């Protein structure tokens, strides 16, 4: 009879040999594998992994690896703290300050995912969990749609825009953003990794279906751009087929989804687009009034009315953030913080691009990071996805992974567990 340890022996064999490093790596792996299932569990495992890794650093003095983004990251954290300190209500910025701890994911990924095989196992676990979340979300869509057909048969589209599927995440934007990043990585895996089993195409179909049913246009845009990039990396000559496939897909889609796509060209008649235009105008006025440190993290909703034109009543909706990463950071934390964030994002992309050009095996990991970066950045023009912990955690993990395959191929794995340089197959 197969024991629990035998079942997970391939995973255990990838952990470091040093005691506290082994514990830290196992706990961090559990954190990564709960990103899509439970935010509370993922952050609890992350905290325990960071504690175990700190003990490992103190006892064993290992070499520490980190992506080359220290300067922009330090400046981003500094300006966030300064903006919070100088805000009209500093207490409202506590959440943004605490969220800076999530950047430890960059450190822990680079040092506790010890080999290309370890990374492959984590990614495959994430792909399966994404499919599970997709199945749950598809069931949620069926329940919601059936209810709306019974209660509001003439306004199904309208109510679907306000009652979307959240998967395990409690909110559709968190679910959609996570699925988008996993989708980009899974497409990279299928197109660019060697010897991939057909089973993973079924997984992709489930994930893609959940993204379509998520009904979120920014997520659709991010996925579309990621696919364009990855097909360009895989078979550039096939790019001309995309417009044809898009047209066929649009014509074959149910009327609800056709209407969702058409609404992009009708911003004044779509409440979610109309409120974004109002928010972006308000954000611009905030930046002009407070260019250096902004109005303060968590303070936008409190001062929102002050930046509307005289006598204008705000559109009813969610006003805690501005549905745009660039405007959000500029208005909330000031232009210096925004500049440091743009530097940080550019450094993450440039680092992945350089690794992409150096590595020969497991190149799909670097391409997944670049595709995920494009999807995340473009979706962030219509949603404040950098400010949502569930999506940010997945993004930081994705952007840390190219360093692992670079170290694996150059033989720079942890001394207590040399990283494998073999290609990752599936």
Name each model feature, range by range:
Residues 31-41, 330-333, 364-403:
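Membrane helix-loop boundary segments at the extracytoplasmic
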Residues 1-92, 104, 113-127, 192-198, ...:
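Transmembrane signal-anchor hairpin modules in multi-pass inner-membrane enzymes, especially those
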Residues 85, 99, 116, 133-138, ...:
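Membrane-integral, polyisoprenol-dependent glycosyltransferases
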């Amino acid at each position: 009879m197969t024991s629990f340890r035998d079942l997970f022996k391939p995973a255990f064999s990838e952990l470091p040999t040093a005691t506290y490093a082994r514990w830290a790596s196992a706990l961090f792996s559990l954190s990564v594998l709960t990103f899509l299932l439970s935010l509370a569990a993922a952050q609890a495992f992350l905290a325990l992994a960071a504690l175990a890794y700190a003990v490992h650093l103190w006892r064993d003095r290992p070499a520490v690896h980190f992506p080359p983004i220290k300067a922009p990251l330090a400046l981003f954290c500094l300006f966030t703290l300064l903006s919070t300190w100088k805000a009209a209500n500093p207490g409202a910025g506590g959440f943004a300050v605490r969220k800076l701890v999530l950047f430890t994911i960059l450190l822990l990924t680079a040092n506790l995912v010890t080999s290309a095989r370890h990374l492959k196992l984590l990614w495959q676990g994430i792909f399966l969990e994404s499919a599970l979340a997709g199945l749950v979300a598809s069931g949620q869509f069926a329940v919601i749609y059936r209810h709306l057909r019974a209660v509001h048969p003439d306004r199904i589209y309208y109510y679907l825009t306000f009652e979307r599927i959240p998967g395990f995440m409690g909110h559709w934007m968190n679910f959609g953003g996570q699925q988008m990043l996993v989708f980009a990585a899974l497409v990279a895996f299928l197109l660019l990794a060697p010897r991939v089993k057909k089973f993973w195409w079924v997984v992709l179909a489930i994930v893609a279906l959940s993204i379509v049913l998520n009904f979120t246009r920014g997520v659709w845009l991010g996925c579309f751009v990621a696919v364009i990039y990855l097909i360009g990396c895989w078979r550039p000559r096939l790019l001309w087929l995309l417009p044809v496939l898009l047209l066929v897909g649009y014509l074959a889609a149910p009327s609800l989804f056709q209407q969702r796509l058409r609404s992009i060209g009708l911003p004044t008649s779509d409440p979610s687009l109309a409120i974004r235009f109002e928010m972006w105008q308000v954000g611009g006025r905030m930046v002009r009034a407070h260019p250096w440190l902004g109005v303060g993290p968590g303070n936008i909703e409190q001062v929102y009315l002050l930046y509307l034109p005289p006598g204008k009543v705000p559109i009813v909706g969610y006003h805690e953030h501005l549905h745009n990463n660039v405007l959000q950071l500029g208005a909330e934390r000031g232009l210096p913080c925004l500049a440091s964030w743009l530097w940080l994002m550019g450094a993450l992309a440039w680092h992945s691009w350089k690794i992409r050009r150096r590595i020969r095996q497991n190149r799909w990991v670097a391409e997944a990071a670049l595709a995920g970066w494009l999807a995340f950045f473009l979706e962030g023009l219509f949603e404040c996805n950098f400010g949502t912990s569930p999506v940010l955690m997945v993004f930081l993990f994705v952007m840390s992974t190219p360093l692992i395959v670079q170290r694996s191929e150059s033989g720079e794995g942890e001394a207590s567990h040399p990283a494998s340089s073999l290609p990752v197959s599936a």
